[in-house]
């Protein structure tokens, strides 16, 4: 059936009987990084061997269909049936090898990098693949969808991301479920000593948020309203920005360690985004949020990593889950209404609700493992969700949380405008920010580096800040 796709050497070696959808191909790289023209032709097959090795665990052999690169990271799994382009570009997956439980991946190809009326990516959650590598059981040689412009194999090769097929992902997930998320490695076309510790780099030991956060403030305008929200970018998804601007809030995004409490008075609300890794690495963000809570009455909302950072700023603690929650169908109970919502989730840490002070209450709880899924302040307009109400992909059951936040922001803005002495003239800071172009996040690298790239320096807010933040230069 697939004999016309095999290399001559493979055909003469009698390998045809062993070839099916799971044995995938090496793709030609697009050195100019241009999106190719739409094509439904099957990707040529290469029988290059690849290995997926779990540290101190099983070794799986398969076939490479992505970049020829060796990487290591934390092996995690998602049970989502669809949405692999969104998942792979989600900054929360930075440093992780993503195992898909859905047996057939790649059947609808990869869409273009088209942008919507707000200048946001329509089909991706960031400009580049953020996962270190992917593991699938079967890869579809043929893809078909009206938005597709290239195959999953071509995309992975162009982005420098290794991918392996022909792996029994059921066995992988069973192991990870019982043993917990583990360090792992993908190797393409060569052998190595899997017992060497240096073959595995632990991304949890790195401040991953620093790698995916914007390097300088940028602005996304909304023509649908006059609210203005400051967003702390810990690795924000495009659909979070879209969920805010489509509701009439212009958004100014700041680096994760920006001293937001020093500029909060310029805004009508503060939002803390999702992000990858261990939240305890973000010590300066926690410090800045704590100062914000002490000096401001602004409405605040956090999602995923933002939820955890709010909890840490409030004095609570976080815990690492055994294998995390990564799916589009996880039930979360709203403790204020008793209603259950099906939610999209992607996190490996959770807030320990037993460490909350009396000012904070649980908002949501996970009905699968009883972990905390949200917080709400007893008297102030501050709340958070561990899951993703913006979905992309996933159900939209909880999208009303954005409506609730926008209502809080509008109420605060209306209250502030009732004071005649409040000036409506834009501050020099905001005038400066409106002229800034967005600085994209760095794409995932084939091998994880301990080196942290330098930050672009822009706006000086002055005054003492929490280490390790380094003030940025320019007039405020």
From Swiss-Prot:
Transmembrane segments in this chain: where? none
* GO MF terms, alphabetically ordered: ATP binding; carbamoyl-phosphate synthase (glutamine-hydrolyzing) activity; glutaminase activity
Presequence range in chain numbering: 1-24
Asked if Iron is a keyword of the record, the answer is no
- The catalytic site is made up of 304 (nucleophile), 388, 390
Q: Which residues form the Glutamine amidotransferase type-1 domain?
A: 228-415
Q: Could you tell me the keywords of this UniProt record? A: Amino-acid biosynthesis, Arginine biosynthesis, ATP-binding, Glutamine amidotransferase, Ligase, Mitochondrion, Nucleotide-binding, Transit peptide
Self-association and partners: Heterodimer composed of 2 chains; the small (or glutamine) chain promotes the hydrolysis of glutamine to ammonia, which is used by the large (or ammonia) chain to synthesize carbamoyl phosphate.
Protein name, UniProt field: Carbamoyl phosphate synthase arginine-specific small chain
- The source organism is Phaeosphaeria nodorum (strain SN15 / ATCC MYA-4574 / FGSC 10173)
């Amino acid at each position: 059936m697939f004999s016309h796709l095999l290399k001559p050497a493979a055909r003469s070696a009698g390998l045809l009987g062993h070839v099916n959808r799971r044995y995938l191909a090496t793709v030609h790289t697009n050195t100019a990084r241009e999106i190719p023209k739409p094509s439904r032709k099957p990707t040529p097959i290469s029988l290059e061997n690849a290995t997926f090795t779990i540290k101190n665990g099983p070794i799986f052999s398969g076939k490479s269909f992505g970049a020829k690169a060796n990487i290591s990271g934390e092996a995690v799994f998602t049970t989502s049936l669809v949405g692999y382009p969104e998942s792979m570009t989600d900054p929360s997956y930075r440093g992780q090898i993503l195992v898909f439980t859905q047996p057939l991946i790649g059947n609808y190809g990869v869409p273009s990098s088209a942008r919507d009326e707000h200048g946001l990516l329509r089909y991706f959650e960031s400009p580049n693949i953020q996962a270190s590598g992917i593991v699938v059981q079967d890869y579809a040689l043929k893809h078909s969808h009206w938005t597709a412009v290239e195959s999953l194999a071509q995309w992975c090769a162009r982005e420098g991301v290794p991918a392996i097929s022909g792996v029994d992902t059921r066995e992988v997930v069973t192991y990870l479920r019982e043993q917990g998320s583990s360090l792992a490695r993908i190797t393409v076309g060569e052998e190595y000593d899997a017992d060497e510790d240096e073959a595995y780099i632990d991304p949890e030991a790195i401040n991953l948020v620093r790698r995916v956060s914007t390097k300088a403030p940028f602005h996304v305008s909304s023509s649908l309203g006059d609210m203005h929200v400051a967003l702390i970018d810990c690795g924000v998804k495009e659909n979070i920005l879209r969920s805010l601007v489509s509701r009439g809030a212009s958004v100014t995004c700041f680096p994760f360690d920006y001293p937001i409490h020093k500029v909060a008075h310029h805004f009508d609300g503060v939002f803390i985004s999702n992000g990858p890794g261990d939240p305890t690495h973000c010590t300066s963000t926690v410090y800045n949020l704590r100062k914000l809570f002490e000096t401001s009455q602004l409405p605040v909302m956090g999602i995923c990593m933002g939820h955890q950072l709010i909890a840490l700023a409030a004095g609570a603690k976080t815990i690492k889950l055994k294998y995390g929650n990564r799916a589009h169908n996880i039930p979360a109970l709203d403790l204020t209404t008793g209603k259950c919502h099906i939610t999209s989730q992607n996190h490996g840490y959770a807030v320990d609700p037993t460490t909350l002070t009396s000012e904070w209450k649980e908002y949501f709880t996970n009905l699968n493992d009883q972990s905390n899924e949200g917080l709400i302040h007893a008297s102030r307009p501050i709340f958070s969700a561990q899951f993703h109400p913006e979905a992309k992909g996933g159900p939209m059951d909880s999208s009303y949380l954005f409506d609730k936040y926008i209502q809080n922001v509008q109420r605060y803005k209306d209250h502030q405008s009732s004071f005649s002495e409040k000036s409506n003239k834009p501050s020099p800071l905001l005038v400066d920010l409106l002229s800034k172009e967005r600085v994209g996040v760095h794409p995932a690298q084939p091998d994880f580096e301990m080196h942290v790239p330098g930050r672009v320096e822009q706006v000086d807010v002055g005054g003492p800040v929490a280490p390790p933040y380094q003030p940025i230069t320019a007039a405020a």
